[in-house]
């Protein structure tokens, strides 16, 4: 999607994927800890996550909207792989973390923009 310049769509699906992976992993620690799945997600986060977040944090208001949209999408769509009610506590914890990330883009907006500018990254 990023190569096709569908950047906002890429950010949205990345955050949906992160949300669902994290509550699956947290709710199934015994299966996931030290697993190949976990290693693959770590590699994905380092490669694709870096690129997606470099773009996403360039427009903090859009990022907040995308986080809200990802949460709403997760809420309104079933998860056949990991039903939400089977990991309700883990899901609540992950949602709280995502909401804290969203809030940090408000609380630390000036600092985020300044750091991006210092690193030669665009603020949109």
Residue spans for each PLM region:
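Hydrophobic/aromatic side-chain positions at a characteristic register within alpha-helices
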Residues: 2-3
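Long, low-complexity, acidic Ser/Pro- and Gly-enriched intrinsically disordered regions
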Residues: 30-124
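Boundary/linker segments of alpha-helical solenoid repeat arrays
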Residues: 20-30
């Amino acid at each position: 999607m990023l190569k096709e310049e569908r950047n906002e769509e890429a950010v949205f699906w990345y955050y949906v994927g992160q949300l669902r992976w994290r509550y699956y992993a947290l709710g199934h620690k015994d299966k996931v800890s030290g697993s190949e799945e976990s290693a693959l997600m770590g590699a994905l986060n380092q490669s694709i996550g870096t690129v997606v977040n470099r773009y996403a944090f360039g427009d903090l208001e859009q990022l907040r909207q995308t986080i809200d949209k990802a949460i709403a999408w997760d809420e309104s769509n079933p998860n056949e792989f990991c039903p939400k009610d089977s990991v309700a506590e883990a899901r609540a914890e992950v949602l709280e973390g995502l909401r804290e990330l969203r809030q940090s883009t408000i609380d630390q907006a000036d600092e985020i923009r300044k750091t991006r500018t210092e690193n030669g990254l665009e603020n949109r």
